[in-house]
Amino acid sequence: MKKKLYIAYGSNLNLNQMKYRCPTAKLVGKGTIENYELQFKGMPNCSYATIAPCIGKSVPVALWELQPRDEKLLDRYEGYPSHYFKQDLPVKLNNGSELTAMVYIMNLKQDFGLPSASYYDTVLQGYKDCGFDMKVLNEAVNDSAEKYYENLEQNNLFDSPDEDMGMGGMSL
C-alpha cells in the first residue's frame, strides 16, 4: 500500500475531525504554502476554505500521511472531483525542509462567501490544534466577505435604500 502526503489548510486541520474522517491518517508535520492565500468560496453563507495563488502571502498547513483508504474517504468528503480538484504543491516545513504533497483546491468557478458559524468553528479549532496564528484565518474571512459584498454591489444586487423604505424612489 502506497502512502500519500496530504496538505490540510481548512477544516482538516482539526485533529478530531481528521481522526473521525481518516482514522489511519497520521499528522507528520506543519508548514506553509508560499505565494498562496486562504479564501472562502461557495454559497453566500455556507462557504468553504480553499487556496488561490497570491504573490507574497502564505497559508499555514498541516501535513498528513494518508493510507489509500484515507484518500478515498477524503475524496468523498471534499466532493472530488466536482467540488474540489487535486494538485501537488510544494510545502515549506517548519523545520526548513521542502517537499511536494497533494492538496484539494476548490473548482475556480465558485463565488466568494462567508463560512457558516459551525464550519468556521471547526477551522478555528484546527488552527488552535496546530498552534497557527489566527490572523491568517480572520483575514481570509474578512477578505472573502469584502469580495462577496463587492460582487453584490457590482451586479446591483442590493436594493436602493429608497426602495427598501417603500417611498417609490422619493427622498424626503
Give residue spans per PLM region.
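Glycine-aromatic micro-motifs
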Residues: 1-172
